[in-house]
Protein backbone atom coordinates (compact mmCIF):
# COMPACT_ATOMS: atom_id res chain seq x y z
CA UNK A 1 0.00 0.00 0.00
CA UNK A 2 1.08 3.54 -0.76
CA UNK A 3 -0.43 6.31 1.33
CA UNK A 4 -0.88 9.53 -0.61
CA UNK A 5 -1.21 12.68 1.49
CA UNK A 6 -3.24 15.29 -0.40
CA UNK A 7 -2.16 18.12 1.83
CA UNK A 8 -3.55 21.52 2.71
CA UNK A 9 -1.45 24.48 1.64
CA UNK A 10 1.04 25.64 4.25
CA UNK A 11 0.86 29.08 5.84
CA UNK A 12 4.01 29.91 7.79
CA UNK A 13 2.15 31.12 10.88
CA UNK A 14 -0.31 28.20 10.98
CA UNK A 15 -0.05 24.55 12.01
CA UNK A 16 -0.39 23.67 8.31
CA UNK A 17 3.29 24.55 7.93
CA UNK A 18 4.24 22.03 10.62
CA UNK A 19 2.06 19.34 9.06
CA UNK A 20 4.15 19.63 5.90
CA UNK A 21 7.21 18.59 7.87
CA UNK A 22 5.91 16.21 10.51
CA UNK A 23 2.86 14.36 9.18
CA UNK A 24 4.61 12.29 6.47
CA UNK A 25 7.25 11.13 8.98
CA UNK A 26 4.70 10.31 11.68
CA UNK A 27 2.46 8.44 9.25
CA UNK A 28 5.33 6.41 7.82
CA UNK A 29 6.60 5.45 11.28
CA UNK A 30 3.13 4.44 12.46
CA UNK A 31 2.15 2.38 9.40
CA UNK A 32 5.48 1.21 7.92
CA UNK A 33 4.02 2.03 4.52
CA UNK A 34 5.34 4.16 1.70
CA UNK A 35 4.08 7.76 2.05
CA UNK A 36 3.90 10.18 -0.89
CA UNK A 37 2.88 13.83 -0.52
CA UNK A 38 0.81 15.42 -3.28
CA UNK A 39 1.46 19.15 -2.94
CA UNK A 40 0.10 22.04 -4.96
CA UNK A 41 3.41 23.89 -4.77
CA UNK A 42 3.87 27.42 -3.53
CA UNK A 43 0.86 29.35 -2.31
CA UNK A 44 0.23 33.01 -1.42
CA UNK A 45 1.18 33.60 2.22
CA UNK A 46 -1.31 36.46 2.51
CA UNK A 47 -4.49 34.78 3.70
CA UNK A 48 -7.90 36.29 3.06
CA UNK A 49 -8.51 38.63 6.07
CA UNK A 50 -9.89 36.66 9.01
CA UNK A 51 -9.41 33.30 7.27
CA UNK A 52 -6.72 30.62 7.51
CA UNK A 53 -6.13 30.38 3.76
CA UNK A 54 -6.33 32.45 0.57
CA UNK A 55 -9.68 31.92 -1.14
CA UNK A 56 -8.19 32.33 -4.61
CA UNK A 57 -4.86 30.65 -4.01
CA UNK A 58 -6.41 27.58 -2.41
CA UNK A 59 -8.17 26.72 -5.66
CA UNK A 60 -4.98 27.12 -7.67
CA UNK A 61 -3.30 24.80 -5.17
CA UNK A 62 -6.04 22.16 -5.34
CA UNK A 63 -6.10 22.27 -9.14
CA UNK A 64 -2.38 21.50 -9.26
CA UNK A 65 -2.94 18.58 -6.90
CA UNK A 66 -5.69 17.22 -9.15
CA UNK A 67 -3.42 17.43 -12.18
CA UNK A 68 -0.84 15.26 -10.43
CA UNK A 69 -3.45 12.73 -9.31
CA UNK A 70 -4.88 12.47 -12.82
CA UNK A 71 -1.42 12.02 -14.31
CA UNK A 72 -0.63 9.19 -11.86
CA UNK A 73 -3.82 7.39 -12.88
CA UNK A 74 -2.96 7.84 -16.55
CA UNK A 75 0.49 6.39 -15.95
CA UNK A 76 -0.88 3.42 -14.02
CA UNK A 77 0.87 4.34 -10.77
CA UNK A 78 -2.21 4.11 -8.55
CA UNK A 79 -2.82 0.54 -7.41
CA UNK A 80 -5.45 -1.46 -5.57
CA UNK A 81 -5.14 -0.95 -1.82
CA UNK A 82 -3.64 2.54 -1.99
CA UNK A 83 -4.94 5.11 0.48
CA UNK A 84 -5.49 8.82 -0.14
CA UNK A 85 -5.53 11.04 2.95
CA UNK A 86 -6.88 14.56 2.48
CA UNK A 87 -5.65 16.75 5.33
CA UNK A 88 -8.54 19.11 4.56
CA UNK A 89 -11.68 17.19 3.63
CA UNK A 90 -13.27 20.29 2.08
CA UNK A 91 -11.50 19.64 -1.21
CA UNK A 92 -13.68 19.11 -4.30
CA UNK A 93 -10.91 17.15 -6.04
CA UNK A 94 -11.98 14.14 -3.97
CA UNK A 95 -14.99 13.85 -6.28
CA UNK A 96 -12.74 13.61 -9.33
CA UNK A 97 -10.47 11.17 -7.48
CA UNK A 98 -13.42 8.90 -6.76
CA UNK A 99 -14.58 9.32 -10.38
CA UNK A 100 -11.23 8.13 -11.75
CA UNK A 101 -10.88 5.24 -9.32
CA UNK A 102 -14.40 3.92 -9.96
CA UNK A 103 -14.28 4.20 -13.75
CA UNK A 104 -10.75 2.82 -14.04
CA UNK A 105 -11.50 -0.04 -11.65
CA UNK A 106 -8.83 0.80 -9.09
CA UNK A 107 -9.81 -0.18 -5.55
CA UNK A 108 -8.54 2.64 -3.35
CA UNK A 109 -9.62 4.03 0.01
CA UNK A 110 -9.96 7.73 0.82
CA UNK A 111 -9.95 9.56 4.14
CA UNK A 112 -10.44 13.22 4.93
CA UNK A 113 -9.95 15.46 7.95
CA UNK A 114 -12.88 17.85 8.39
CA UNK A 115 -12.12 21.32 9.75
CA UNK A 116 -15.16 23.45 8.89
CA UNK A 117 -17.80 24.15 6.26
CA UNK A 118 -21.12 25.81 5.52
CA UNK A 119 -22.76 23.65 8.18
CA UNK A 120 -21.01 25.84 10.78
CA UNK A 121 -22.87 29.18 10.87
CA UNK A 122 -19.76 30.90 12.26
CA UNK A 123 -17.45 29.70 9.46
CA UNK A 124 -16.79 31.87 6.41
CA UNK A 125 -18.86 29.51 4.26
CA UNK A 126 -21.64 29.48 6.81
CA UNK A 127 -21.72 33.27 7.16
CA UNK A 128 -21.34 34.24 3.52
CA UNK A 129 -23.02 31.34 1.70
CA UNK A 130 -25.11 29.65 4.37
CA UNK A 131 -27.37 26.80 3.34
CA UNK A 132 -27.28 27.47 -0.40
CA UNK A 133 -28.18 24.18 -2.13
CA UNK A 134 -24.97 24.03 -4.14
CA UNK A 135 -22.69 24.12 -1.09
CA UNK A 136 -24.74 21.71 1.02
CA UNK A 137 -24.95 19.19 -1.82
CA UNK A 138 -21.22 19.64 -2.48
CA UNK A 139 -20.36 18.92 1.14
CA UNK A 140 -22.63 15.90 1.26
CA UNK A 141 -21.06 14.61 -1.95
CA UNK A 142 -17.54 15.06 -0.61
CA UNK A 143 -18.52 13.30 2.61
CA UNK A 144 -19.87 10.35 0.60
CA UNK A 145 -16.66 10.16 -1.45
CA UNK A 146 -14.63 9.48 1.68
CA UNK A 147 -14.45 6.00 3.15
CA UNK A 148 -13.24 7.59 6.38
CA UNK A 149 -14.46 10.98 7.57
CA UNK A 150 -12.29 12.17 10.45
CA UNK A 151 -13.39 14.75 13.03
CA UNK A 152 -11.35 16.03 15.96
CA UNK A 153 -14.26 16.42 18.40
CA UNK A 154 -17.69 14.99 19.12
CA UNK A 155 -18.97 18.55 18.97
CA UNK A 156 -17.86 18.79 15.35
CA UNK A 157 -19.59 15.54 14.43
CA UNK A 158 -22.82 16.73 16.04
CA UNK A 159 -22.55 20.10 14.28
CA UNK A 160 -22.04 18.38 10.92
CA UNK A 161 -25.02 16.08 11.55
CA UNK A 162 -27.35 19.03 12.17
CA UNK A 163 -27.16 19.94 8.46
CA UNK A 164 -25.90 16.84 6.65
CA UNK A 165 -26.47 13.10 6.71
CA UNK A 166 -24.02 11.06 8.78
CA UNK A 167 -23.08 7.42 8.30
CA UNK A 168 -21.63 6.21 11.61
CA UNK A 169 -19.65 3.45 9.90
CA UNK A 170 -17.55 5.98 7.98
CA UNK A 171 -17.34 8.69 10.65
CA UNK A 172 -14.47 8.69 13.15
CA UNK A 173 -13.62 10.90 16.14
CA UNK A 174 -9.82 10.89 16.27
CA UNK A 175 -7.03 13.05 17.59
CA UNK A 176 -5.32 15.29 15.08
CA UNK A 177 -1.77 14.20 14.09
CA UNK A 178 0.00 16.80 16.20
CA UNK A 179 2.01 14.73 18.66
CA UNK A 180 5.07 16.68 17.54
CA UNK A 181 3.73 19.65 19.52
CA UNK A 182 4.05 17.88 22.86
CA UNK A 183 7.80 18.46 23.05
CA UNK A 184 8.32 21.15 20.42
CA UNK A 185 7.63 23.97 22.89
CA UNK A 186 9.86 22.66 25.69
CA UNK A 187 12.29 25.56 25.32
CA UNK A 188 9.48 28.00 26.15
CA UNK A 189 8.35 26.13 29.27
CA UNK A 190 9.66 27.48 32.57
CA UNK A 191 10.09 31.04 31.32
CA UNK A 192 9.49 33.86 33.78
CA UNK A 193 5.80 34.69 33.72
CA UNK A 194 4.51 38.24 33.65
CA UNK A 195 1.02 39.71 33.96
CA UNK A 196 0.31 39.07 30.30
CA UNK A 197 -2.98 37.94 28.75
CA UNK A 198 -3.00 36.78 25.12
CA UNK A 199 -5.60 36.72 22.36
CA UNK A 200 -4.01 34.12 20.04
CA UNK A 201 -6.92 33.75 17.59
CA UNK A 202 -7.60 35.05 14.10
CA UNK A 203 -9.08 38.54 13.95
CA UNK A 204 -12.52 37.49 12.76
CA UNK A 205 -16.11 38.17 13.90
CA UNK A 206 -16.54 34.72 15.43
CA UNK A 207 -13.56 35.32 17.73
CA UNK A 208 -15.21 38.37 19.39
CA UNK A 209 -12.10 40.50 19.69
CA UNK A 210 -14.20 43.45 20.93
CA UNK A 211 -14.67 41.63 24.23
CA UNK A 212 -10.91 41.28 24.62
CA UNK A 213 -10.37 44.96 23.83
CA UNK A 214 -12.97 45.96 26.41
CA UNK A 215 -11.35 43.77 29.05
CA UNK A 216 -8.11 45.63 28.45
CA UNK A 217 -9.82 48.88 29.38
CA UNK A 218 -11.29 47.44 32.58
CA UNK A 219 -8.16 45.60 33.76
CA UNK A 220 -5.35 48.14 33.24
CA UNK A 221 -3.12 46.31 35.73
CA UNK A 222 -2.55 43.58 33.13
CA UNK A 223 -0.97 43.59 29.68
CA UNK A 224 -3.27 42.48 26.85
CA UNK A 225 -1.85 41.49 23.45
CA UNK A 226 -3.68 40.54 20.25
CA UNK A 227 -1.09 38.29 18.64
CA UNK A 228 -2.16 38.76 15.02
CA UNK A 229 -1.72 42.52 15.33
CA UNK A 230 1.98 42.04 16.10
CA UNK A 231 3.12 40.30 12.87
CA UNK A 232 5.00 37.77 14.96
CA UNK A 233 7.28 35.00 13.81
CA UNK A 234 6.55 31.55 15.25
CA UNK A 235 9.46 31.99 17.67
CA UNK A 236 8.23 35.40 18.82
CA UNK A 237 4.70 34.05 19.24
CA UNK A 238 5.89 31.13 21.32
CA UNK A 239 7.98 33.48 23.44
CA UNK A 240 4.82 35.41 24.28
CA UNK A 241 3.04 32.17 25.14
CA UNK A 242 5.91 31.26 27.43
CA UNK A 243 5.68 34.61 29.23
CA UNK A 244 1.87 34.76 29.44
CA UNK A 245 -0.15 33.69 32.44
CA UNK A 246 -3.44 33.48 30.57
CA UNK A 247 -4.84 32.69 27.11
CA UNK A 248 -8.36 34.06 26.67
CA UNK A 249 -11.16 32.84 24.41
CA UNK A 250 -14.68 34.09 23.78
CA UNK A 251 -14.89 32.15 20.52
CA UNK A 252 -18.16 31.41 18.79
CA UNK A 253 -16.47 28.92 16.45
CA UNK A 254 -14.12 26.17 17.57
CA UNK A 255 -14.09 22.53 16.53
CA UNK A 256 -10.73 21.78 18.19
CA UNK A 257 -8.62 24.75 19.26
CA UNK A 258 -4.85 24.61 18.97
CA UNK A 259 -3.73 27.91 20.50
CA UNK A 260 -5.11 27.19 23.96
CA UNK A 261 -3.39 23.79 23.87
CA UNK A 262 -0.09 25.42 22.90
CA UNK A 263 -0.55 27.86 25.76
CA UNK A 264 -1.21 25.07 28.26
CA UNK A 265 1.94 23.27 27.07
CA UNK A 266 3.97 26.23 28.36
CA UNK A 267 1.86 26.70 31.51
CA UNK A 268 -0.46 29.47 30.34
CA UNK A 269 -3.91 29.14 31.91
CA UNK A 270 -6.63 28.58 29.28
CA UNK A 271 -9.79 30.60 30.00
CA UNK A 272 -12.45 29.26 27.65
CA UNK A 273 -16.27 29.31 27.40
CA UNK A 274 -18.29 26.20 28.21
CA UNK A 275 -19.44 25.70 24.61
CA UNK A 276 -18.29 24.31 21.26
CA UNK A 277 -15.42 21.80 21.44
CA UNK A 278 -14.24 23.36 24.69
CA UNK A 279 -17.09 21.66 26.56
CA UNK A 280 -15.72 18.16 26.02
CA UNK A 281 -12.04 19.08 26.01
CA UNK A 282 -11.45 21.51 28.87
CA UNK A 283 -11.32 20.75 32.58
CA UNK A 284 -13.97 22.46 34.68
CA UNK A 285 -11.33 24.69 36.30
CA UNK A 286 -10.78 26.47 33.00
CA UNK A 287 -14.34 26.82 31.69
CA UNK A 288 -16.62 29.76 32.40
CA UNK A 289 -20.40 29.85 31.73
CA UNK A 290 -21.14 30.24 28.03
CA UNK A 291 -23.70 32.99 28.64
CA UNK A 292 -20.96 35.34 29.84
CA UNK A 293 -19.68 35.85 26.28
CA UNK A 294 -22.43 34.51 24.01
CA UNK A 295 -22.48 37.97 22.46
CA UNK A 296 -21.31 41.45 23.38
CA UNK A 297 -24.57 42.37 25.09
CA UNK A 298 -24.36 39.37 27.40
CA UNK A 299 -20.70 40.09 28.00
CA UNK A 300 -21.54 43.60 29.24
CA UNK A 301 -24.11 42.11 31.63
CA UNK A 302 -21.54 39.65 32.98
CA UNK A 303 -18.42 41.80 32.68
CA UNK A 304 -17.93 41.83 36.44
CA UNK A 305 -17.94 38.04 36.60
CA UNK A 306 -15.50 37.79 33.68
CA UNK A 307 -13.06 40.27 35.20
CA UNK A 308 -13.31 38.63 38.64
CA UNK A 309 -12.43 35.28 37.06
CA UNK A 310 -9.46 36.76 35.24
CA UNK A 311 -8.15 38.42 38.40
CA UNK A 312 -8.41 35.09 40.23
CA UNK A 313 -6.41 33.32 37.53
CA UNK A 314 -3.76 36.03 37.38
CA UNK A 315 -3.29 36.60 41.10
CA UNK A 316 -3.46 32.91 42.04
CA UNK A 317 -1.62 31.64 38.97
CA UNK A 318 0.56 29.07 40.73
CA UNK A 319 -2.48 27.41 42.31
CA UNK A 320 -3.56 26.29 38.83
CA UNK A 321 -0.31 24.68 37.68
CA UNK A 322 -1.31 21.17 38.76
CA UNK A 323 -4.59 21.47 36.86
CA UNK A 324 -2.77 22.77 33.79
CA UNK A 325 -0.62 19.64 33.86
CA UNK A 326 -3.73 17.43 34.04
CA UNK A 327 -5.26 19.38 31.17
CA UNK A 328 -2.19 18.92 29.00
CA UNK A 329 -2.07 15.18 29.65
CA UNK A 330 -5.72 14.81 28.67
CA UNK A 331 -5.28 16.82 25.47
CA UNK A 332 -2.09 14.97 24.55
CA UNK A 333 -3.79 11.61 24.79
CA UNK A 334 -7.24 12.34 23.38
CA UNK A 335 -7.04 15.22 20.93
CA UNK A 336 -3.49 15.89 19.76
CA UNK A 337 -2.20 12.42 18.96
CA UNK A 338 -2.70 10.79 15.57
CA UNK A 339 -2.56 7.17 16.78
CA UNK A 340 -6.25 6.43 16.16
CA UNK A 341 -6.05 8.17 12.79
CA UNK A 342 -3.08 6.04 11.75
CA UNK A 343 -4.87 2.92 12.97
CA UNK A 344 -7.91 3.68 10.83
CA UNK A 345 -5.72 4.21 7.77
CA UNK A 346 -3.80 1.01 8.39
CA UNK A 347 -7.03 -0.96 8.71
Model-derived segments and their meaning:
Residues 144-186:
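Donor nucleotide-sugar binding/catalytic pocket of nucleotide-sugar-dependent glycosyltransferases
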Residues 251-252:
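Aromatic "clamp/platform" in nucleotide-sugar-dependent glycosyltransferases that forms part
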Residues 1-96:
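N-terminal pre-catalytic "stem/leader" segment of glycosyltransferase-like enzymes
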Residues 83-90, 102-124, 131:
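Active-site proximal beta-strand in glycosyltransferases
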Residues 293-347:
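A charged, aromatic-enriched C-terminal amphipathic alpha-helix characteristic of glycosyltransferases
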Residues 269-272, 279:
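Short hydrophobic beta-strand element within catalytic cores of glycosyltransferases
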Residues 128-149:
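Membrane-proximal helix-turn-helix segments that form the acceptor-binding/catalytic region
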Residues 178-207, 213-217:
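Conserved donor-binding/catalytic core segment of Leloir-type glycosyltransferases
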Amino acid sequence: MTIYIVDIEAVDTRYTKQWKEYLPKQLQRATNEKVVVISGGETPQATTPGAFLNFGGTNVYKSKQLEQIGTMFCEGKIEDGDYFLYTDAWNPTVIQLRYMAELLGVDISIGGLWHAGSYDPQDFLGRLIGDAPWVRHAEQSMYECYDDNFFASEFHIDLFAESLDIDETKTHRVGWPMEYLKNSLDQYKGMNKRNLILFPHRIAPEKQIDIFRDLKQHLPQYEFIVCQEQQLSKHEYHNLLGEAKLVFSANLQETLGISWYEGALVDAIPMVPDRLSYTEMALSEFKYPSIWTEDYTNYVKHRGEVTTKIVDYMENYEDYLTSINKQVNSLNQNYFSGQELYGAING
